[in-house]
A protein has these predicted regions:
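Alpha-helical transmembrane segments in multi-pass membrane proteins
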Residues: 1-39, 86-90, 201-214
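Membrane-interface helix/loop boundary segments of multi-pass membrane proteins
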Residues: 101-127, 162-170
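Functionally important transmembrane alpha-helices
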Residues: 148-208
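Membrane-interface capping segments at transmembrane-helix boundaries
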Residues: 40-47, 217-232
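Small-polar-interrupted transmembrane alpha-helices in polytopic inner-membrane proteins
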Residues: 65-68, 95, 119-135, 157
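Hydrophobic alpha-helical transmembrane segments
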Residues: 57-61, 89, 120-125, 147-151, ...
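Juxtamembrane "helix-exit" motif on the non-cytosolic side of transmembrane helices
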Residues: 5-15, 70-81, 134-140, 187-194
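Juxtamembrane helix-entry segments on the extracytoplasmic side of multipass membrane proteins
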Residues: 80-92, 139-152, 201-202
Length: 232
């Protein structure tokens, strides 16, 4: 159902960018309501909205990853231009619907319901499903560059899955992180900043990804000592 929703060709009937984003946003919010009702009646999982533990402060160094594309702009100096259009605010609301729908499905439901004992195995499998889902971008455009999307979404999915388990299934954390990542790296960067991408763009992406991977490995070593979600 979710694949149908995401791949549905709204653009065949809706030519206005504003109304296209509006239709996709409404469709995702309807899907969120459906998932919440389905979970309520089936009693699959409990979804904690927000709580805080002192160990959550160790997640703060992961925040710089949110700005990964903007580090590239620091190298460009004055080589970019900010442009706003009428779709700006609807894109923000759309990214909220993306974060809610994808985190509810892939983390709260799929990752929670996987019948796997080890926490890291559940994170890995849910991240793989999350990455394969993003192959829809390739099948909708048949652009070879879109084949790289599942690679970075696997890394993002693993990070979100780790944060989800570390924070004891804090839904607000993963939704907030996912929303800000998309807002900063897609809306503000891709849609608002007219920049070209040269080799420095990819060098920057690799460096930021390497930092995130190293810090996650560090947290993995700590996890069995300070976090009960990983003590199995």
């Amino acid at each position: 159902m979710f694949l149908f929703l995401v791949a549905f060709p709204f653009d065949l009937w809706i030519k206005s960018s504003f109304y296209l984003y509006l239709a996709e946003t409404l469709a995702r919010f309807i899907f969120v309501v459906f998932l919440l009702m389905y979970n309520h009646f089936k009693k699959l999982v409990t979804i904690p909205i927000c709580h805080f533990n002192k160990t959550d402060l160790l997640l703060l160094p992961l925040l710089p990853i949110l700005f990964c594309n903007f580090y590239y702009l620091l190298e460009m100096r004055n080589g970019f231009q900010i442009t706003l259009d009428e779709t700006f605010f609807i894109q923000i609301i759309f990214q909220i619907s993306v974060a809610l729908s994808e985190e509810l499905l892939f983390r709260s439901l799929i990752q929670n319901c996987l019948s796997l004992k080890k926490t890291l195995t559940r994170i890995f499998v849910s991240s793989l499903i999350f990455a394969l889902f993003h192959l829809t971008y390739f099948f909708s455009s048949f652009n070879l560059i879109s084949l790289f999307v599942p690679l970075y979404t696997f890394g993002l999915g693993f990070l979100l899955g780790f944060v989800y388990e570390w924070s004891e299934k804090n839904f607000l954390y993963i939704c907030g992180y996912h929303f800000l990542f998309n807002l900063i790296n897609q809306v503000l960067y891709t849609y608002m900043l007219n920049v070209g991408e040269d080799y420095l763009f990819y060098v920057n992406a690799v460096c930021v990804g390497a930092f995130g991977a190293i810090y996650l490995i560090f947290l993995l070593f700590l996890s069995k000592r300070v976090n009960k979600s990983f003590q199995r």
